[in-house]
Structures are given as structure tokens and as C-alpha cells.
């Protein structure tokens, strides 16, 4: 219902009084706000300072992440200020947690430059995270409108094209990370790549911190790695790859390394999250132009995603990276050595793989999201996984994933090739059991033991790592109220 002229006049008079007035009074709180299809929505977990009303704190977050400053400024009247103000429209207490609240905030699409993650983040996670009115602030989820998503390229290659290029269907991809991360010579590095691929893996990869150090310069690594790839591919008659990490100090250096990776025949290159959003988008544009798969290692994400009351949830990174245009991103294993609640991990994977997701509070998805035909990102599971967990990995993560066994390949007592073979046989036996309709989750250990009767490397792996697990309580789980209609 439209406001009367008198009401609008009164609000305008109050809203533009000189001096400092509450953010809620300035128009950054609107409990009756009607969400537009083109609005960008954000959900923040706020911990107000003692004595600060949660509605005022939410309005302050809306204001400081959009158009407000600490005092009323008359130049607001030169803009469409009532449109451009972000609106906090709902505040809910966080279930079972004292003094924390979920604040829902809507932003008009015109506040953001088209196709720019850097501009989006400058507002959403900018100065507002240092705001004194809140003790802690965490960005939990976002909804991107279709009109905004259409301004982004999306994944350079995408899952479907990658499967066609690799000629691998009906199962997860298998990979491994070269270990040790640092210190190998180029020749020894290439040998590790060859042995892993010869044993049956689809991919080997560089780790996040191998760039161009004195013990092995990047060009040497690229040449020896691709020698291993080509030799293993010719031997197996299959397409294989190695993620060549092109991360460097400048964009010029990264472009040079990426161009060289293309010249020596690589089908995939790799970057780290720490290079920044603009660099990631730039490399994604380069990758699509040059028909390359682009792998992203999430190095650095836990510095702001792991703590539950401050920073941002990794699902937001998943959304931004799908928009930015990467083809792979590390997204958790559930059973490995790194942080990962099963339901939350499922939410990450759905965010990367589904064309449309619904609200699912147990998975931490607070908004429905239509992905506007952006291609799918392949999640990567790595960190502390081994062949003995194959039934759990297939159950939790499904087919559309890269299973990366680093130590679980290179740590095999009989050598790298044997470690790769153990993982390949474990995966094939589990996929076969699933396709035959067997209860592969309940009977997984027995299926693996049966397969090991004709595969010595698998038997050795099961004997070595059978008791290895990482059963720690996750620090980041979904907060929701259990009800008979909960979306579980």
C-alpha cells in the first residue's frame, strides 16, 4: 500500500535531519519491504555489541554496506537514495545461540557493477566487517538474481564438456597431489606425475605453494610434468592431465605461464584463491578463450571461513567462484583431515553442481537460487582420504567430483604406481557394486576386501590405512530449528 503524502513528507523530514540519527530511522530497516526479483540478497550472522538493538545493528550493516556513512549527508538528496539504500527486512535469533542474530538484507541490483566480483565484495564484505556496532559479523549466504548472473561468464569449461574432453563417464575423476609439496627437482617431479598417471589416475596436480622456487623453476616443472603426462597417456591410450599451477606475483607472469602450459600441450592449468577475485576472473576469461580447464585451489579460505561467528561461509565462496568462472574448486571430503560437516559439504556440492537449489536449512542454504544456465563447477575432494574410505566417498559425494588421493597414493609402501592402482581398483569395484544394485555403503569394507584378493596394491593400502580416520567435531554446522517440516 502506498504511503500518503503526509507520511512521506514526515519520513523524509526525519530521515534527513542534520547530525547522527539511528540507521533504522534513516531507512535501512524496513520490515514491510517487498523483495524484488532483481534484488541481491544477503544473510549475515551478527553479534551486536552489548546494549545494541539487533534491528539497529542489522540496519547499520545494511547502511554501511550500501550508501550510509556515520552522519546524515545532504548529497543523498541528489541520488535515488530511497532506492539505493540496502534494506534490512528480517531479523531472527540464531537457534540455540545467545546474542547472535540472522539479518536478511536486500540490495538493489544497480548498486553493483555488472560482471565484477571485486565490486560486489567491496560492498558486501568491505568496511562493514570492521564496524564497531557489532562484535562479530559473518556472511552466511547470498542470493544472486538471474539478471545479475547473466553478466558473468561462469565456468570456463564446465563439468559436461570436461567429461567429454576426458572421455570419463559414470564415475568420479581420480587424482593425486604431488608430494612432498616442495623440494623435488624437476626430473623427480615429472617421475611422480608419470607414475601416478601410469597407475590409473586421471589427473596429477601441483600443490598450492609450488610456483617457481630455487629448487625448481616453473618452466622446468611444466616440461618434466608434461613429459610424464604424454608418456602415461600414450601407454594407457587415455586422455590424462596434470594441473600446472600458474600462480605468480603478477598477471603478466601468470599469463606467460598459462600460455606456456597451453603450448606444451596441457589441457588444464591451476590457480590459487589467494591471487584475488579480479585475477581469478581474468584467468577464467583466458581459460575459456584458450579452451583450457581451470582448477582453483582454495588456499587461504579457512582464514575467514572456519570461525562460525566472523568471516564468511565457504558456500558464499562457492557461489562467487561459479560466477567468476573456475571449473574446479576444493570443496571438502567429509571423511578427510580437513574441516567438513556432511550436510554443509552437501550444500557446497549442490551449490557448485545444481542448476537450481531450494532453501535447505540443514545444508545451510537460506535462499533458493536459480543459476541462470551457468555451467557446473566440479568439486574436488582432497586431504586425508584413502582407498579404504571409497564407499563413504562415493556415498557422500557422488560421481561428479574429483577424488584427490595425495598421501593416499604417494604414501603407498609399494610405490606411487601401486598407490594409484589401489585407488583405481577400489573405485571401480565400488562403482560396479553400486551399478549392480548392491548396498555398497553397508557392504563397502567387504567389497574392498574381495577386490583386494586379486589386487595386491589394494590389499597393502587397506592393511596400512584401515584404522586411519579423522573424527573431529566440525566447527561449522548449520543452525536451524528441528521441526516436522524441516527440509532434511
Swiss-Prot record:
Binds 1 Mg(2+) ion per subunit. Pfam families: RuBisCO_large, RuBisCO_large_N. It is an enzyme of class 4 (lyase). One of its GO terms (molecular function) is monooxygenase activity. It catalyses: 2 (2R)-3-phosphoglycerate + 2 H(+) = D-ribulose 1,5-bisphosphate + CO2 + H2O; D-ribulose 1,5-bisphosphate + O2 = 2-phosphoglycolate + (2R)-3-phosphoglycerate + 2 H(+). The active site is at residues 179, 297. RuBisCO catalyzes two reactions: the carboxylation of D-ribulose 1,5-bisphosphate, the primary event in carbon dioxide fixation, as well as the oxidative fragmentation of the pentose substrate in the photorespiration process. Both reactions occur simultaneously and in competition at the same active site. HAMAP family: RuBisCO_L_type1. The basic functional RuBisCO is composed of a large chain homodimer in a 'head-to-tail' conformation. In form I RuBisCO this homodimer is arranged in a barrel-like tetramer with the small subunits forming a tetrameric 'cap' on each end of the 'barrel'. Belongs to the RuBisCO large chain family. Type I subfamily. This is Ribulose bisphosphate carboxylase large chain. It comes from Pyropia suborbiculata.
Amino acid at each position: 500500500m502506498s504511503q500518503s503524502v503526509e507520511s512521506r513528507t514526515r519520513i523524509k523530514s526525519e530521515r534527513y535531519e542534520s547530525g547522527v540519527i539511528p540507521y533504522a530511522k534513516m531507512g535501512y530497516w524496513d520490515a514491510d519491504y517487498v523483495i524484488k526479483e532483481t534484488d541481491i540478497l544477503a544473510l549475515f550472522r551478527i553479534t551486536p555489541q552489548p546494549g545494541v538493538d539487533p534491528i539497529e545493528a542489522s540496519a547499520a550493516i545494511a547502511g554501511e554496506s550500501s550508501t550510509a556513512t556515520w552522519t546524515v549527508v545532504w548529497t543523498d538528496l541528489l541520488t535515488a537514495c530511497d532506492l539505493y539504500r540496502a534494506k534490512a527486512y528480517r531479523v531472527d535469533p540464531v537457534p540455540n545461540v545467545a546474542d547472535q542474530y540472522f539479518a536478511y538484507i536486500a540490495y538493489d541490483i544497480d548498486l553493483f557493477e555488472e560482471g565484477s566480483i571485486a565490486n560486489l565484495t567491496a560492498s558486501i564484505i568491505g568496511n562493514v566487517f570492521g564496524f564497531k556496532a557489532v562484535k562479530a559479523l559473518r556472511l552466511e549466504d547470498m542470493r544472486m538474481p538471474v539478471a545479475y548472473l547473466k553478466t558473468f561468464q561462469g565456468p570456463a569449461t564446465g563439468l559436461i564438456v570436461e567429461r567429454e574432453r576426458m572421455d570419463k563417464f559414470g564415475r568420479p575423476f581420480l587424482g593425486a597431489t604431488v608430494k612432498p609439496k616442495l623440494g623435488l627437482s624437476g626430473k623427480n617431479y615429472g617421475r611422480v606425475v608419470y607414475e601416478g598417471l601410469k597407475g590409473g589416475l586421471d589427473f596429477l596436480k601441483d600443490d598450492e605453494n609450488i610456483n617457481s622456487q630455487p629448487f625448481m623453476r616453473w618452466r622446468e616443472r611444466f616440461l618434466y610434468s608434461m613429459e610424464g603426462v604424454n608418456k602415461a597417456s600414450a601407454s594407457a591410450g587415455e586422455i590424462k592431465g596434470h594441473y600446472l599451477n600458474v600462480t605468480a606475483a603478477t598477471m603478466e607472469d601468470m599469463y606467460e605461464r598459462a600460455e606456456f602450459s597451453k603450448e606444451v600441450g596441457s589441457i588444464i592449468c591451476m590457480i590459487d584463491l589467494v591471487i584475488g577475485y579480479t585475477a581469478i576472473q581474468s584467468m577464467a576469461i583466458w581459460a575459456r578463450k584458450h579452451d583450457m580447464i581451470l582448477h582453483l585451489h582454495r588456499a587461504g579460505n579457512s582464514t575467514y571461513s572456519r570461525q562460525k561467528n566472523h568471516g564468511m561461509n565457504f558456500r558464499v565462496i562457492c557461489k562467487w567462484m561459479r560466477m567468476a568462472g573456475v571449473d574446479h574448486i576444493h570443496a571438502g571430503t567429509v571423511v578427510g583431515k580437513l574441516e567438513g560437516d556432511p550436510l554443509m559439504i552437501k550444500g557446497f556440492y549442490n551449490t557448485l553442481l545444481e542448476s537450481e537449489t531450494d532453501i535447505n536449512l540443514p545444508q545451510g542454504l537460506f535462499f533458493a537460487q536459480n543459476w541462470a544456465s551457468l555451467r557446473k563447477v566440479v568439486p574436488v575432494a582432497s586431504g586425508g582420504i584413502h582407498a579404504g574410505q571409497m564407499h563413504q566417498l562415493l556415498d557422500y559425494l557422488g560421481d561428479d567430483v574429483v577424488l584427490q588421493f595425495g598421501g593416499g597414493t604417494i604414501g603407498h609402501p609399494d610405490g606411487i604406481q601401486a598407490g594409484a592402482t589401489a585407488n583405481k581398483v577400489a573405485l571401480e569395484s565400488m562403482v560396479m557394486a553400486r551399478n549392480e544394485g548392491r548396498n555398497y555403503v553397508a557392504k563397502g569394507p567387504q567389497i574392498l576386501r574381495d577386490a583386494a584378493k586379486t589386487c595386491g596394491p589394494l590389499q597393502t593400502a587397506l592393511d596400512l590405512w584401515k584404522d586411519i580416520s579423522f573424527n573431529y567435531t566440525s566447527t561449522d554446522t548449520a543452525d536451524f530449528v528441528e521441526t516436522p517440516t524441516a527440509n532434511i
